[in-house]
C-alpha cells in the first residue's frame, strides 16, 4: 500500500522474470500462500500457452492448497502429471525427473552462446524450453531423503534453467540435521515488495 497525504492505494508487487532463486514461504502464513496463488496466476497469464508446466505437490491438504487451480489438472500440457502429487513415491519421481531435465539442460543445451533458460530461448525461438513452476506445500511432509537431495539441486540450479521452486516450509520440522544442506540452498522470502 502506498500513501501520500489524503491519497492511498495498493500497488502490485514487482516481480522480475525469470526468477533468480527459489521462492520460499513460511507454511502457515495465509497471506504468503495467497502470494503463491497470485504468482501462479501471473505466470499463467504472462506466458504463452504451452510455455509453462506446473508440478503441484500438496501432501497434507490433498490438493486443497492449490484449490483455485484444480480445474487446470485436465490440461495435460499444463500439468503433465494430471493431478496434485500427494504421496512420497510420486513426489520423488517428479522431483527426480525435473532434476534430470535440469542436468540435461546444463550439460547438453547450454553452451558458450546460452548459459541459461532466457538466453537459450532467445537464440532458439522456434523450439523454446517451457518454464516450469514446482509448487510444494507442507515441506518436509512426504519428502524422502532422495527427494530432499533432488529439491536441493532444483533450488540451486533450477532458476537459471527455467524451473522455479515455490516452497512452503514448516520451519519447525526442518530443524533436523538431515535438512541442513537443503536449507542452506534456500533464501527465505522477505516482504520487501520485490521478490
Predicted regions and their residues:
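P-loop NTPase catalytic phosphate-binding loop
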Residues: 2-115, 124-195
Amino acid at each position: 500500500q502506498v500513501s501520500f497525504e489524503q491519497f492511498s492505494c495498493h500497488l502490485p508487487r514487482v516481480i522480475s522474470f525469470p526468477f533468480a532463486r527459489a521462492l520460499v514461504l513460511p507454511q502457515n502464513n495465509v497471506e504468503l500462500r495467497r502470494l503463491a496463488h497470485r504468482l501462479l496466476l501471473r505466470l499463467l497469464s504472462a506466458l504463452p500457452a504451452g510455455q509453462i508446466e506446473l508440478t503441484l505437490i500438496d501432501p497434507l491438504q490433498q490438493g486443497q492448497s492449490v484449490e483455485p487451480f484444480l480445474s487446470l489438472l485436465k490440461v495435460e500440457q499444463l500439468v503433465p502429471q494430471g493431478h496434485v502429487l500427494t504421496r512420497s513415491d510420486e513426489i520423488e519421481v517428479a522431483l527426480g525427473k525435473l532434476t534430470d531435465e535440469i542436468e540435461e539442460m546444463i550439460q547438453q543445451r547450454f553452451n558458450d552462446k546460452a548459459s541459461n533458460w532466457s538466453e537459450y530461448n532467445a537464440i532458439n525461438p522456434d523450439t523454446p524450453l517451457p518454464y516450469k513452476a514446482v509448487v510444494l506445500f507442507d515441506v518436509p511432509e512426504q519428502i524422502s531423503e532422495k527427494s530432499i537431495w533432488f529439491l536441493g539441486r532444483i533450488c540451486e540450479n533450477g532458476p537459471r534453467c527455467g524451473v522455479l521452486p515455490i516452497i512452503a516450509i514448516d520451519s519447525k520440522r526442518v530443524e533436523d540435521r538431515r535438512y541442513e544442506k537443503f536449507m542452506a540452498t534456500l533464501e527465505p522470502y522477505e516482504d520487501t515488495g520485490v521478490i
